[in-house]
């Protein structure tokens, strides 16, 4: 092969040397010595020491009878590999040496060469091989053969076989390295060549400690010993088979030899000894193996047969025993069955007694409930009269007060007292059944109550007058003492002041006080006169002018009048909400500066300091330390013990609607204060519940109700909810309470008294929900179960109160979504999860020697220098070939673009930075060339004498080339030639004109996506992975890479080019600086940070209301308006604050958390500073008492349930002092719950208007139905109701059909069972009748359900009617279904009332029907009926006589009898309850109650039945064994003698045939 590769084409000696890789390959494949040694070993006879093998002494290496398959070719060494044929005889090695050991060496010397210290049994064969001397002769013989044979070359096929062996070797080496089991043999033979043998240590490390040897291993070793002995014995007897065995061992090596076996190979015959040995071996195997195996099989078959026989015997025994047990069970079943039937009868009668007791209790309970109901009605009537009495008494008191004030006549006193007369003397109640029951009324004397009411009113009036007189006298004495203590004279008023002789008459007009700085309007002056008149008469009042009409000013003017005209300088107590405290203080300071006002608020320490001025000695004069105390409701409750020490001349309660609850602590505390007069100020209409009206009445007239605790008890029962069906009475009482309040209340509205106020315009602004709001709104709506809402709205009153709060929570969720989705679900700041990765460490050795660029150090030289087509030498040779032929050169274009071969090589081989710089330089060159061609002047010649290198560059003249794009402004704005945004598109836009209403449509304008929508951030971020190496050069290289490489590379990355970097450093000194390039010119849409903060634009665009508010505020600010924005939710005000900051609107905020001092300063700043555009207020905190007339626009972001609250809020701007027109905007989301809330607020406003004007009354509480109507649209509610009714109807219909089917199936099943049982009894011939034995414990019951007789002395069954249910139904039937149409028809035959046979076979013949006797039917005895006569009772179908066969069918009707008994008992109980109820009132019932009732029979009982209880022949409560038996009718009356005489006849006929007429 080498000779073929080395042969040249022409055989010349000038051939170049072979490539190095071929030389390396030939040297690596030099295998001659290995092949020679291997062939010598393989061709040597293994058993050469035996003399019987017939070896040839002349040729010891080639046996005579050896197998030629194992002969391996011996090839001479290859001369091309640098060896000669005589290399083996060069004397380097002894030709007769083996493994470097001479043949003459002894075994002891060989043993010193190896380490056999740790050699165990498993490796002893290695020792025998290493110490053997068998290979010396083979080596000498192989050397002789090498000299004799001629040189042979290695064939190609053998080379391929060797390569394949090499491949197999690699494959198995890989398997060895991966398999743990194979790795234990790592030092199997190599350990013998070293001083330390690590084989066993390696094996122990991989396999672990030795496992315990189990018995199986011991057995296996014993078997292995036997096999070895057997093999040894076989080898002794068959020594001739060794060549064949030798052939088998060398089969593995023979397959590498390509010589075919000789065709004529003779088969060797065995000797007799060999055959005997084989025969003996066969017999031994038969005796040792086959015979025990056959014996085992036979014994196992016998055991299996015995086992199966035993199982079969057990099964047969079980079957026989089961049959015997069944027979015994059948024999013993009679007595337990009888006992069971006895127990069932006992349970039946116990159940009967229980049902009877329950019906009796139910009747008593119903009668008791009826009595309770009548008692409640009487109590309600009594309470009604009592309330009428109290209201009449209050009207009389008010009449006395108004008569004194108005000096009127006394003509209406009788009219008031006439209301106590009660014209109704009796009451009729209609009870079911058509019976009218008259209930006697309790005695009521109207004259007595008239006198009592008049007396109480006069006493209360006199007590009030006396209390007022005593208070005035005490105040007079205190004031006189204070005057005497002061060293002053002529203080203005003397001591002659007295309320008994008022100086001002009731009709005289009082002028405005002189100490009041200001001008009162006409209606305000009238209000002050009315208040002064009330004070003179000692009457408390309510000033209820509409908000903004100056209630505060009128109150201050009244106090100034008292100080100026009456010399009453206090002390006055002003109590108001916290939001209006500063307003009261400012108004006092502004209008009456002579008053010393003491603001009582602050922390406990400040209030303690203020209370130092509270001295009783220094009060009541003009020189007192204070005249007026202003405080809040909360502080009054906290410091009540200090306020009760002072006797207040006048107490003014601002926003008096806070006192509407008489059970509150505030109401009770303020009622106990010592004061001469009380004045309540309220701008809202009087509330429309009786309890709230009475609370105001009691507060202004405490003397009238001091002794009447029953009034409180009356309202604590909540009479409105208790008597819902008596609304007419409530309306009458409510109108009377309003009439009582009229003399003590003054109310004016703006449009009636004030024409100077500007108009107020209210505008509803409807907003659309955004997509996010719609999704949230629909999600909330889907979570609501319409059925649950409807069910909760239709529940009881108690359930309605419980569900209203949960429904209101749903309403608040919907309102949050309408206001802003951020209230429901806030968008939080988003940031990815950031982690810091640890740097991975690289060892210094790997860094310096293991990297690819270091490992392949010659790669760059080969690829970039020697083999690269862009090498400068190659480009030069391609352009200038030595033969002068350069037509096919691929680099001929370089001369036309002015690029040298070196520049081309740099572009292609020096990396990306060189190309980038070259591109930058080429763009500059193209720009210069473009300028040169565009602005160069022609030289006058027609053509040039030569062409320049750049004349062939045509790209510069292209219209969209870089120089043209830079120089032309129109080309810069092209789509693909200018810088674009990250995300943009082209859509149509409508452009509106500013000064006209026209608009135009512009198509395909560049549209940028909003920045808050461009959010594409990773979920996890990390610092780029760094490396660390303990090497100085590695750290230097890492630092260079971190800095961006070289300076030029860094400048290109940041600025785009080195020249641009220089310009960037000097940009501040340039007038027109160059735009930045590289990374500095990149501006990401959301910045370089991945943290995403929700934009304020999304805050506006996510809410339809806030978007509408944004547009509205922009317009209002441009027009110079000032705005008040009201909202009920504090979180919504927080969002509005964020919006104001974003839009840069100047604003202020006031809510419930603002302090009192801050509220005063904020209101003052808003009134005085014009730069504040918006005032954010909460509806509850900022809607009371403050003056914000500087604003002319009010915006309600969300509406309140109560329209009065919104009215108060908008009147903060629309009040006295407002000169501009006030515009009120109300933001409403269209199609949502807010529309329905606004509608309800309008309805409520109308109701309040009607109530204050004395109209009808309507409760002011939200019911569940109303809340459900807010949650659902009317159409949706109607649709849901229709669907629900349709589903309910379908469900009822399907249930009815299923019930009918179930009953029919049950009836058919029972019928089938009864027929089967009847047939079985007919076959067995069972027809037993147990004789009648009267007993008291009902023990005469049959065991098998046969005929038995009703004992005479048994308990009387509950009668129901003349025809019982059990006699109507067929045998084994079920209770009748009223909706079923397939039941039996009951025939009422007149002939059935004919005389019947006395001597009938029915056991019930001893009893008779009492109902006919009671109803007046004559009783007579008739002869017995014959065979031809029918023995049917009245109302029974024809052929329904009783037979023994029919009696046998009645034993399976237990449940039917029980249900019949329950129904009959229920009917009887209902009748008894009705009778008992009527009897409780002393009336009898003429009809409507069954004549068989126990009550009726006990009243009208025939004389002939004195010895027997009334028992109906068709009673459903008969014996359960007679259920379904058709019992014929009996005579109307029987005597004891006739019944006893017929006893024997009954017993005789019980065994005979059936009576006539029976089936």
Curated annotation (Swiss-Prot):
GO terms for cellular component: cytosol; Ino80 complex; microtubule; nuclear body; nucleus; spindle. Residues 1510-1521 have a biased composition (Low complexity). Residues 532-703 form the Helicase ATP-binding domain. One of its GO terms (molecular function) is ATP-dependent chromatin remodeler activity. GO terms for biological process: cell division; cellular response to ionizing radiation; chromatin remodeling; DNA-templated transcription; double-strand break repair via homologous recombination; mitotic sister chromatid segregation; positive regulation of cell growth; positive regulation of DNA repair. Residues 282-407 form the DBINO domain. Residues 46-88, 213-250, 1285-1319, 1391-1464, 1504-1559 are annotated as: Disordered. Residues 1-268 are annotated as: Assembles INO80 complex module with putative regulatory components INO80E, INO80F, UCHL5, NFRKB, MCRS1 and IN80D. The modification N6-acetyllysine is found at residue 118. Residues 1285-1297, 1306-1319 have a biased composition (Basic and acidic residues). PROSITE patterns: DBINO (PS51413), HELICASE_ATP_BIND_1 (PS51192), HELICASE_CTER (PS51194). The DBINO region is involved in binding to DNA. This is Chromatin-remodeling ATPase INO80. It comes from Mus musculus.
